[in-house]
Structures are given as C-alpha cells and as structure tokens.
Curated annotation (Swiss-Prot):
GO terms for cellular component: cytosol. This is Probable chorismate pyruvate-lyase. Its main location: cytoplasm. Keywords: Cytoplasm, Lyase, Pyruvate, Ubiquinone biosynthesis. GO terms for molecular function: chorismate lyase activity. Belongs to the UbiC family.
Length: 197
C-alpha cells in the first residue's frame, strides 16, 4: 500500500501548514512566544525500507537518525525524524551531529548549496508502523498518548554534495499553531493540557 503521495489532502489552515514550503521551525516560532526543540534520540538506527528507498539507497539497513519534538510555548506539536547514511553524517551532513537543541532548519535553510525535492504527504493510520513509532516516542517524551488516530505527515529529501537527507515531519498535536493566530503579537496559546518538559 502506497503511503506517501504528492497530494495534500488536509483542509483549511492545517492544509496550509502541512503544505507550506520554507522552514517549519521559523513558522512555528512565529506562532508563539517561545519555540524549542526537544531531542529524543540521535545516532545509528535501523531504517525502514521505505526510508532507504526515499534516500535512493535501497540497500541501506542502518542510518544516522535524529528524532525531535518541536514545541511552541512548551506544548509539543510536531514530531520530526531526519535520516541520512552514516558516512554522510560524517561528511556533507556532519553539522547535524552538533545541533543539540538547535533546529535542523538552521542548517537546511541557512546555508547555500542545498537542494530540496517537492514535498510528499501522508495520513498515518493508527495501524501503521510509522504511527506506532511516533505514538511510542510521543508518549515517552510527553507522558501523554496521541489523541489522533490519523496523523498528517510530510517529508522531503534535502541533498548536499550528492548526499541525501530525508526529513519527515508529523503534525501530531490535535490542538496546535495551525489552529492559532500565526503572529508574534499573540499573547499565548489557548489553554491546553501541559506536557512534561
């Protein structure tokens, strides 16, 4: 079954958020008073065959992976997973190793010589391995189960010096900036259940 498509099936403001080009981190930062990155894991991990195929490296079994939660005013809103071949994480993409809690966007949109493929979109169903992976990571990081059985997601491949980097972003929060006013003058988000830091 094909998961990823060129078609963005979301509606309204959520569709605009999921389909927006440019830096998602910058867009999130503009939606609240404080934007932050929580690193969940970083290092060598087994890859899904679909990830390896998206990288054009179908035989790749293990890659360098960075997983984070993107937060707005302390509320977790997006799960992001970045994947590249291990040698590339020591070469063209070595800067991702030292990001710490800085967003990957600092590298992707702040430097020259990086190309990006068009966005692909998916609605991750609760029975899918990707949904289960995100749900497990989300619960471990926030202490809260995912409220949505279907998760809007997008991905694209960034290439630098012939080295591909796959970036997937899952819009996992049921109430998030795509339902708020996207302006820095907003005093704060509506009342939401607080998650663990």
């Amino acid at each position: 079954m094909k998961v990823w498509s060129k078609r963005n099936v979301q509606r309204g403001n959520r569709k605009r958020w999921v389909g927006a080009t440019g830096s998602l981190s910058a867009r999130l930062a503009a939606a609240g008073q404080r934007f932050s990155v929580q690193v969940l894991s970083q290092g060598l991990q087994a890859l899904d065959p679909d990830e390896a195929s998206a990288l054009g490296l179908s035989r790749l079994k293990v890659g360098y992976v960075r997983e984070v939660l993107l937060r707005v005013d302390e509320v977790a809103v997006v799960f992001a997973r970045s994947v590249t071949a291990h040698p590339h994480s020591q070469g063209p993409w070595r800067s991702i190793r030292g990001l710490g809690t800085r967003p990957l966007a600092d590298v992707l949109f702040g430097q020259h010589g990086i190309a990006r493929t068009p966005l692909q979109f998916a609605s991750l169903q609760v029975a899918s391995s990707l949904h289960r992976h995100v749900a497990h990571a989300w619960l471990g990081a926030t202490g809260a189960a995912l409220a949505s059985r279907v998760l809007p997601a997008r991905r694209s491949v960034f290439t630098r010096g012939a080295a591909p980097l796959l970036v997937m972003e899952v819009f996992a929060a049921p109430h998030a900036p795509w339902g708020w006013l996207t302006t820095k003058t907003r005093r704060g988000p509506p009342a939401l259940p607080r998650t663990k830091p």
